[in-house]
Structure formats: structure tokens, C-alpha cells
Amino acid sequence: MPSPRIRKMSLSRALDKYLKTVSVHKKGHQQEFYRSNVIKRYPIALRNMDEITTVDIATYRDVRLAEINPRTGKPITGNTVRLELALLSSLFNIARVEWGTCRTNPVELVRKPKVSSGRDRRLTSSEERRLSRYFREKNLMLYVIFHLALETAMRQGEILALRWEHIDLRHGVAHLPETKNGHSRDVPLSRRARNFLQMMPVNLHGNVFDYTASGFKNAWRIATQRLRIEDLHFHDLRHEAISRFFELGSLNVMEIAAISGHRSMNMLKRYTHLRAWQLVSKLDARRRQTQKVAAWFVPYPAHITTINEENGQKAHRIEIGDFDNLHVTATTKEEAVHRASEVLLRTLAIAAQKGERVPSPGALPVNDPDYIMICPLNPGSTPL
């Protein structure tokens, strides 16, 4: 029996058809749309599907891996190319069986770029403060989304898809009926997470946030560019949140997986070094409780300036930059240091009482007389 006749269709047309009939029903439709547009920029897109060989696919792979991402100035990652090849492979399988535009899948036999070990980008205290301040001043919705990501480890798509009818603020649970891995999930909401959500107009039903995926992506890009924060993806906040869960030392791996939605424990192995670091304090059983408490109350760098008050007299202003709006003013430098120490002590004590995270002390600029260390426990020892 003769083989069915091949229908001629260019790869570009096939990608369009795939997007309209197959990809549109997937959760990752938007991402496949972007990848399809990338592929269509290359000569391979003009070839008919039945004419494309493994050599053509390998050439496309190598060309992409040799290119520089104009947005980041870095080489295109292997993960990016691997996902583009996965799209092509899915397309060829559909076309071979259902459309009759090719007889083989040339992508299957081509070597794929290795899967990277994953990004390990941590959000610094300075970046967190700057982004928080920027979003609070510019857009309340972005402010809530940013902090909700850090409190819950939810993915961008999960946050943007939140609906009020799925949020129980009384019991502190957000229900995600559909997630990336195809399973529903209940996300525990900390007190801080609930407080952030309540900044939004609370309704009985409907979307919590109005952003589309592309709109939010653009807003995030603009914010990081204006603040000159390099190489920080929104998805890095999920990594940051999970890292903080491990650093708490009070949650086991299974509990963290239940919060984050990881179906495979292998995905959480990259965080085990954080767990080991936390176990040091538990192994040191002889450490006194006072030492644990004192660990909260460490010195912080502060900037001291001389200002002119309205009455014409000079005053001294001290600002502790690791905290938002933590500053004092006094007529003498000694009094300013004493007040700054008291305010810092009160701030740290309240955070310790509530179990809230505080920023780590930043670096003290070398040989800069305008910077001093403020000690919350012993203001008299603070160098002037």
C-alpha cells in the first residue's frame, strides 16, 4: 500500500496552525507564542516540514546557542534553546500523525542542550528595600504582588490567577485550582501575606489582580531597569522565598514541598546546603539562650550628616539605610547616636517578638567619616 501523499506546509505556517489549534489549550500558551515568534525569524521557518532534516535542526540549535541575548548581553541559555526544540518536537509529532505534512520528527534524534542546574540568584536586602519602596510609591498592586511572592513562593502565573472566592483570609489559605504541574494546591498565608492581600479592595469573587502576564512582565522589566537592578527575574523571588523557608529551620522538606508545589523532592535538593547551615545551631546544644537573643541585636552601618534647621541652628541626622525610614535628628552628635541606638533597638525587638525577618547589616564604606556603626545594645560604645 503506497504511503499517503505529503501535504506541503512551511514550518512558519505549521507553527501558526499549532498555536491556534493545539497550544491555545495549554497553560503555557503565551510562552509557546513567544518561542514560535523567535523560530519564525530564522531561515528554517521558510522550509517545508517534510524537507527539514536533523542537520537543519542541529544547525538551528548551534546558531541559537552562539547568539547573544540583546536584553541581557549574555549568551542565549541552553534552557531557552531546549524549550524551543521541545516546541518543534511537539509540532512535528502532531503534524506527522494528524496533519500529514511530514513523515518523521527530525528533532528526536538531535542532541539537546543540557539542562542547567538552575539559577541561584538571591535577592539582596538592598534590592528588596528599593523594589518595595518603588512599588509602594508607584503602584500598590505591584507592591502587594512583590511581597506576596516572597511570603508564599507562588509562581507569577499563580499569583496573577488568584481569585477572591479561592482565598480564605480568616483561616489563611489560598486555593490554587490549577497549577503548573496540573494539580490543585492550598497555599498557607502568613500574617504578613494576609495583611498585604487586605491592602487590595477585597471582594467576594473575581480576580485579585488585573495584570496580564505580558503586562506584568513589562512592569517588572521597567522597575528593575529604573532601579538598575541587574539579572533579577520575578521567578527568582520564588527561589528566594523557598530559601527563606529552609533558613527558618522550623519546616521540614515535605512541608516546604507542600507549600511550594514541588512534586519531586529532587527539585528541592539544591536547597539542602541551607538546611545543613541551619542545623549548626541545633547541634550546638551548649549555646546559651542569651546568645541566641543577642544574635538579633547586631550593629548596623549608618550615615550621619549635618543639617541646618529652620531656626538656623545646626543639627545632626543619622539614617540607618538597611531599614526603611529609620532616621533620627538631634542637636549634638552624641545625642543623635544615642537616639539612633534606641530606635534601632526598639525596631529589632519588635521584629524579634513578631518573628519577622530583618535585613542583614550592609557593608560599612571604608575610610568614609560620614558612616558609623550604630550598636543597639550599647550606644556608648558606638564609634563617633
Curated annotation (Swiss-Prot):
Organism: Escherichia coli
Record InterPro entries: CB (IPR044068), DNA_brk_join_enz (IPR011010), Integrase-like_cat_sf (IPR013762), Integrase_catalytic (IPR002104), Integrase_recombinase_N (IPR010998), TTHA1013/TTHA0281-like (IPR035069), Tyrosine_recombinase_XerCD (IPR050090)
Source domain of life: Bacteria
Function: Shufflon-specific DNA recombinase.
Name of this protein: Shufflon-specific DNA recombinase
Record domain Tyr recombinase: where: 118-284
Gene name of the encoded protein: rci
Family designation: Belongs to the 'phage' integrase family.
Residue numbers annotated as active site: R155, K180, H235, R238, H262, Y271 (o-(3'-phospho-dna)-tyrosine intermediate)
Transmembrane as UniProt keyword: no
Gene Ontology BP annotations: DNA integration; DNA recombination
DNA-binding recorded as keyword: yes
Lineage: Bacteria, Pseudomonadati, Pseudomonadota, Gammaproteobacteria, Enterobacterales
PANTHER family linked to this entry: INTEGRASE_RECOMBINASE HI_1414-RELATED (PTHR30349:SF94), PHAGE INTEGRASE-RELATED (PTHR30349)
PROSITE patterns: CB, TYR_RECOMBINASE
Keywords noted in UniProt: DNA integration, DNA recombination, DNA-binding, Plasmid
An MF annotation (GO) of this entry: DNA binding
Domain Core-binding (CB), residue spans: 9-96
